[in-house]
Amino acid sequence: MEQCIADFTAYLRNEKKSPENTVLSYSRDLKGFCRFMQEAGVSDAAKVNRTNVMAYVYELQKQKKAGATVSRNIASIRSFYQFLQKKGMVTENPAADIELPKVEKKAPEILSLEKVELLLEQPRGEEDKEVRDKAMLELLYATGIRVTELISLKVSDLNLPLEYIHCGSEAKSRIIPIGAQAKASLHKYMERVREHMISVPEEEALFVNCNGRPMTRQGFWKIIKSYARRAGIEEDITPHILRHSFAAHLIENGADLRSVQEMLGHSDISTTQIYAKVTDRKVDED
């Protein structure tokens, strides 16, 4: 089974061009399932049946895993077996008809516009690092992209004259406008800073760390948290909260749901509708 999982993740990464975080999520879920099956004496993926999968689901529930986690694991196993079916390695999908637990979608946490502006004001210095950080924060809030998408951007994905970025995988590509403020910060970074920070001239990554290598997810998390502390913001700010705030503020200012859905890259508009509910709730509270 381990080799089958390796083949599946290679397929996701190399053929489907799935985001690295998606690949890692599938890998983590399937390795957990593989360990459970090995402990049950089943090491061959072709010998797994529906009862085995249900036993694993019960085990996750016994461990008090969240409904969303259980659903994601079932979906991972189902996708894995769809891959094996296409390869002719199995004839049936043991997770095909297993019902996903109902998951209540929680209202996302958002920052007020005042706190977002306060955060964006923090990198105000002229040092290379602060100019870069300003560009990253402005771009993240101006576009609502995911942190994995932010750090995956290449120089070729940025079009400053036409004020947009090209974002996403080949299968789910989208063009997102960046706005004047983010454009100004990016122009300053590109003109004055980036060439001093990259370690090799052929570096394609738009944003690099202080060693000149592509910025990492963990590196950017540290950056955003340091500026939140500097701003005196008590909320536990994450890059995703800026994404939530971007969406909620757009809707609050009259943007239509379909446009916001396209910018965020949501496949289902019901996900985007959550932000409208947050905005409505805020109006009621006011």
Put a short name on every predicted segment.
Residues 1-286:
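Conserved catalytic core of the tyrosine transesterase superfamily
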